[in-house]
Amino acid sequence: MARMIHCAKLGKEAEGLDFPPLPGELGKRLYESVSKEAWQGWLKQQTMLINENRLNMADPRARQYLMKQTEKYFFGEGADQASGYVPPAQD
């Protein structure tokens, strides 16, 4: 049976993650309060940030930037947007 949580990002009951997606306290916090659906949304956002900002994931500063963006995306005012990105129009 799926583990249900109240998702901090979506504000509704949803299926929780199967395991902490990151090490440390942030990973534990994400595991306890982020749904699979919200995590998939973050992975798309993260990919855009990596590509648009040409982040080198071997660089500790790039990894630190993404950790801060992860926390802002789920628990803060929202992560940075990729420059020039326009979300698709909703029909």
Curated annotation (Swiss-Prot):
One of its GO terms (molecular function) is iron ion binding. GO terms for biological process: cellular response to oxidative stress. InterPro entries: Fe_traffick_prot_YggX, Fe_traffick_prot_YggX_sf. SUPFAM superfamilies: YggX-like. One of its GO terms (cellular component) is cytosol. Keywords: Iron. Coiled coil: none annotated. The keyword Transmembrane does not apply. Pfam families: Iron_traffic. Belongs to the Fe(2+)-trafficking protein family. Could be a mediator in iron transactions between iron acquisition and iron-requiring processes, such as synthesis and/or repair of Fe-S clusters in biosynthetic enzymes. This is Probable Fe(2+)-trafficking protein. The lineage of its organism: Bacteria, Pseudomonadati, Pseudomonadota, Betaproteobacteria, Burkholderiales.
